[in-house]
């Protein structure tokens, strides 16, 4: 999204999978899903017990049981990621606020919103659809935040339909 603002000529369409301009709540008008204190607590857990953090976060992200294939993949990926790099990534994601950038996007967008997403509520997909000038909102009937991993067939089908291929 940000790249399309800086270099719009490089993009003819965007496909946004489970996007959010901000995970943080910004009362009263924007509900990103998390209060700052909650995310700071999550970062503290990460600092104190990285493996415990990954065991907690993996099923939250996947929206599946701890022993599911998708959750297991997340746990394995977290386990092999340098905690310092994971922390930098988590900080950049959790505390970013790109709401002002949304209206700057002029590239047509497909928003793939997960129906039951613990990280990005459906209201965020609706917010993006309302604020992205040329967007389509497609609700994927899936749990979790990563349908590209848990239900790639649904994501591919929606992408092909949007791209008309």
Role assignments for model-derived ranges:
Residues 1-48:
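Flexible "cap/lid" loop of the alpha/beta hydrolase fold
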Residues 81, 120, 147-150:
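Residue-level signal for the nucleotide or nucleotide-sugar donor/cofactor binding architecture
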Residues 105, 111-113, 117:
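Short beta-strand/loop motif that positions the catalytic acidic residue
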Residues 25, 29-34, 44-103:
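Conserved alpha/beta-hydrolase catalytic His-Asp/Glu region
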Residues 8-9, 106-107, 134, 165:
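Active-site acidic short loop of glycosyltransferases
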Residues 57, 90, 128, 155, ...:
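Hydrophobic "lid"/C-terminal helical patch
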């Amino acid at each position: 999204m940000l790249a399309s603002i800086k270099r719009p000529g490089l993009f003819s369409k965007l496909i946004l999978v489970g996007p959010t301009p901000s995970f943080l709540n910004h009362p009263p008008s924007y509900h990103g899903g998390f209060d700052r204190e909650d995310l700071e607590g999550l970062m503290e857990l990460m600092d104190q017990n990285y493996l415990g953090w990954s065991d907690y976060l993996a099923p939250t992200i996947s929206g599946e049981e701890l022993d599911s294939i998708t959750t297991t993949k997340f746990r394995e990926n977290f386990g092999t990621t340098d905690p310092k790099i994971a922390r930098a990534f988590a900080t950049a994601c959790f505390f970013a606020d790109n709401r002002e950038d949304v209206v700057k996007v002029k590239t047509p967008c497909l928003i793939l919103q997960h129906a039951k997403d613990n990280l990005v509520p459906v209201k965020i997909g609706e917010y993006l659809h309302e604020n992205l000038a040329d967007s389509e909102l497609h609700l994927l009937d899936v749990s979790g935040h990563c349908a590209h991993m848990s239900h790639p067939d649904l994501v591919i089908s929606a992408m092909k339909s949007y791209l008309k291929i």
